[in-house]
Amino acid sequence: MTFLDHHKLASVIIDRIDPARVTRDLSELITIRSVNPFDDAPSPGCREEELAEIYLAKMQAIRLETGRVDVVDGRPNIWGRLKGKGQGPVVMLAGHMDTVGTDGYPDAFSGRIENGLVYGRGACDMKAALAAFLEVARAIRESAVELPGDLLLVGLCDEEHMMLGSKDFGRTGPKADFAIVGEPTSLRICPAHSGQRTFFIRTYGTAVHSSRPERGVNAIVHMARVINALEGYGENLKRAQHHPLCGYGRFSPGVIRGGSISSAVPDFCELEIDRRFLPGETSEQIVAELRARIDPLAASDNSFRYEIVGPALDVAALDTPVGSPIVLSLVNAATHLFGSPPEIDAFPGGTDAPNLDCPAVVCGPGDLAQAHTLDEYVEVDQVVKAVQLYIHAIVDLMETRT
């Protein structure tokens, strides 16, 4: 099939897009409370199940083959398959169903539509993409176009916390050859992002009454020495290896805990650190870098005791080659639709994309700066453009031989 044929076929499908319908879908999805419960037990309004049930029903109404697996009770992954001819790749459109919390956000679930914007928690992160995925499948179905390969729509749980959904789906879910994850990129094409690992550095001392501090060992004082030893680590990362899209790794001390009462010398202190790492960097490398700075403290002071625990959080890095068919198809689609080559960049945060067991790209409607805010919104026009972009890319990608 030539590029002109791709364009004609995509245009037939795009003609079936209904902007009012995709806007209504998005507004409805926002009204469904799917806040991530984080470490608490799932409860009404704090789990993905209610949204999953509505989304499954919408996929079934389009006559997709659907499935559901609960990763934990009340927290499912779901999917719908639009069958093709069996002669092309399986393309996945994936997004998470959970959102962050809504404290201080009274209109979080309004789904208000005003002046070309849709407001509410999850509007851009990332229910806009979920609504766009539905419209892609509907437009294909209503156009009566039979694709060479299958289209797989996937809703994932727990992205905002431990990414349990995508980790489970990558291991046990239906397989795809390529995936687009619709996180808010303002339709920039992001085939890479750094990973994230958090570690705990713990110092130990000897507790005594603070009237005789010289008889004990102060774990907080030792942690202060650790913090001093780590000064400059972030700057060193800037001068170390670079990734063509992700740039350099980053380090940030984030949380410190220690002591119980001021009248006791503390015997324990803990520092939680965040390390954004480049594709290819390992936990062992990171721990070795930390130890190289802290071990000299122990060598010069017999009372200095510490350990490094983790990673507690481990979000994988993404590194899909820019020459991958999924990247090239999105570039071709965006160039045709919007008149100029699109920006190819690294996504600033972590996503489900590297867990899906296939080449993946992050690309979706919405501005990441609006995510997690108390006035979250997305432009309807960009959601519709996302539907067009996905359709063009899918039609192009379906000619890829895997």
Protein language model regions, located:
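Metal-dependent amide/peptide-bond hydrolase catalytic core
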Residues: 1-10, 14-17, 70-72, 191, ...
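Phosphate-handling active-site elements
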Residues: 104, 114-116, 136-152, 230-240, ...
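Acidic-glycine-rich active-site phosphate/pyrophosphate-binding loop
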Residues: 98-114, 191-202, 329-333
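Acidic/His- and Gly-rich active-site-bordering loop/insert found
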Residues: 2-119, 146-147
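Glycine/serine-rich anion-binding loops at beta->alpha junctions
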Residues: 117-131, 209, 363
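Acidic/histidine-rich catalytic neighborhood of metal-dependent amide-processing enzymes
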Residues: 126-198, 402
